Amino acid sequence: MNKIRVEYFTDTLCIWAYSAQVKLDQLKREYPDGIDLKYRFIPIFAAAHDRIQKGWAEKGGFEGYNAHQLKTARAWEHVELHPGIWVDTVPASSTVSHLFLKAAQLLEQDGHSGFAGESTVPGHTRFESLMWRIRCAFFEDCLDICDLAVLTAIADDMG
């Protein structure tokens, strides 16, 4: 059977990508040998602070964006949102996490021994587990995923 290539464009700070993970997992479960999933990182929130400050200036700024995100997430049973995202923690950019994840993805593709081992999330590769944990670090734990120390701690926790 030929695999269908699915190119998934994503940003680690995008709430829609965070909520869509459940659908990607379902796709992988239902067609384990039928899809070739390729992750592509795009800089929607490359300048997150500026994007929200300007885009939400007349709608309450960061507090307004926070309220919008919390309201949006209430419609989804499968996600949790920390009440302080975009207020208590405002990552400057998603770019640092994208570069960190791309490096991990390349290590996994090359079979690097430092990135070997079991995934921490069933049905995920180690790279996918890391990506999920980074998303959760922001959306659920309100951590600054623009901070390399935060990203390194997440990877270290995976072993």
Regions found by a protein language model. Name each.
Residues 1-7:
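Extreme N-terminal starter segment of soluble prokaryotic enzymes
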Residues 10-13:
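Short pre-active-site segment immediately N-terminal to redox-active cysteine/selenocysteine motifs
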Residues 16:
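Short, cysteine/histidine-rich loop/knuckle motifs that typically chelate Zn2+
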Residues 19-138, 142-148:
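Structural alpha/beta surface segment adjacent to cysteine/selenocysteine redox centers
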Residues 138, 153-159:
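Short, intrinsically disordered, charge-balanced linker/junction segments flanking boundaries
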